[in-house]
A protein has these predicted regions:
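N-terminal binding-site loop/beta-alpha segment at the start of enzyme catalytic domains
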Residues: 1-76
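Short, well-ordered coil/turn segments that N-cap beta-strands
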Residues: 9-16, 48-51, 72-76, 109-113, ...
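Conserved, mostly hydrophobic/aromatic
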Residues: 6, 18, 37, 52, ...
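Glycine/proline-rich, positively charged
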Residues: 29, 42, 88-180, 184-188, ...
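Structured C-terminal cap/extension of enzyme domains
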Residues: 40-45, 188-319
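Structural motif corresponding to the early beta-alpha repeats
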Residues: 71-94, 118
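Active-site beta-loop-alpha junctions enriched in small/polar residues
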Residues: 21-23, 55-57, 81-85, 117-120, ...
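Alpha-helix-loop-beta-strand connector modules within alpha/beta enzyme cores
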Residues: 65-81, 133-143
Length: 319
């Protein structure tokens, strides 16, 4: 496993970060037993992953807690999150703090390494900032070590929230969407996070766009019809197979993880899974060498103008 320092924090994290939400949610959404889900986390730890990301809304914090029982807490980096708003309500400071306390209880830990404000949309950013002073008081109590923020990628393709967050100099860590077909963060944001030494976690690297059969082909067809991609892409037997020629990648998902992993400004790559087989494959991809320079050039040439592609909410969101 490769490890990096997460921005200006003193956290040394694995470049592969196990995401416990999304459509996979450690197999919870596909009916796996709690023990099976716990074993996925344990196997990730056995393979050198020391960075685990969850959230109160995922319903997987208790699973994470059981997986890390009796392990050296100082060797594991835990990231969790709480929403500040939903479509129906705004969470008060006391409700967010209660969520923080519940996270500690569910995982049976004394502190959280990174506590994020979760899925903050641009319209809710100011409200999220109003909660920060109160949360920093909880930080002083030792409940969490670093404050982070994650964007709501499906409603914020311009990544306005992360841009604003960087300007506040309040957040130690940010989580943003980045992929082969969604490179918006390269234009300014990654330069800004690097300049300010803000820890940067990448999500939406694969998601359903690349993992659900037929989804990528449908998206490419739509983009070609909208004149955003060249027509010859429709002539390929498999979607984006031209990228794999002499790239070093085994398949498009392998290419996705490798592209994100070696993007300057990104510290770690989040991946989700519901099986140990996929867990091993994902980690292997993230630890593989950079794609060939010619392949990277093609990715940048054909897709760097796209925005908001592949940014969809998980098909199942746990309540």
């Amino acid at each position: 496993m490769d490890y990096v320092k997460l921005g200006k924090t003193d956290l040394k994290v694995s470049v592969a970060c196990l995401g416990c939400g999304g459509s996979s949610a450690l197999g919870v959404t596909s009916g796996k037993s709690e023990n099976e889900s716990v074993n996925i986390v344990k196997e990730a730890l056995n393979l050198g992953v020391n960075f685990i990301d969850t959230a109160n809304i995922y319903g997987t914090e208790k699973i994470v807690g059981k997986a890390i029982t009796n392990l050296n807490r100082d060797e594991i980096v835990i990231s969790t999150k709480h929403q500040v708003t939903t479509n129906k309500k705004k969470y008060s400071l006391s409700e967010v703090i209660n969520g923080l306390n519940n996270s500690l209880k569910y995982m049976d830990i004394d502190y959280i390494d990174v506590f994020h404000l979760h899925g903050v949309s641009p319209r809710d950013f100011d409200y999220a900032m109003s909660l920060v002073p109160g949360l920093l008081k909880e930080k002083k109590k030792g409940k969490f070590r670093y404050l982070g923020i994650t964007e709501s990628a499906p409603v914020d393709p311009e990544q306005i929230t992360i841009s604003k967050a960087i300007d506040t100099d309040v957040f130690d860590v940010v989580m943003l969407a980045f992929s082969i077909m969604n490179q918006n963060a390269k234009k300014q944001i990654l330069q800004q996070t690097s300049k300010k030494n803000i820890g940067t976690m990448s999500m939406f690297v694969v998601r359903s766009l690349f993992s659900v059969p037929g989804r990528l082909k449908d998206e490419i067809t739509k983009l070609v019809n909208d004149q955003k991609l060249p027509k010859w892409l429709l002539d390929e037997t498999e979607p984006l197979e031209f990228l794999l020629k002499n790239s070093g990648a085994k398949n498009i998902i392998d290419a996705c993880y490798r592209y994100a992993r070696h993007q300057k400004g990104i510290d770690c790559v989040l991946f989700g899974t519901s099986s140990i087989e996929h867990l091993k494959n994902n980690i292997k991809s993230i630890l593989s060498p950079q794609l060939s320079l010619a392949t990277v050039k093609n990715i940048d040439q054909y897709f760097n103008h796209l925005k908001g592609v592949g940014l969809d909410f998980p098909e199942k969101i746990l309540k």
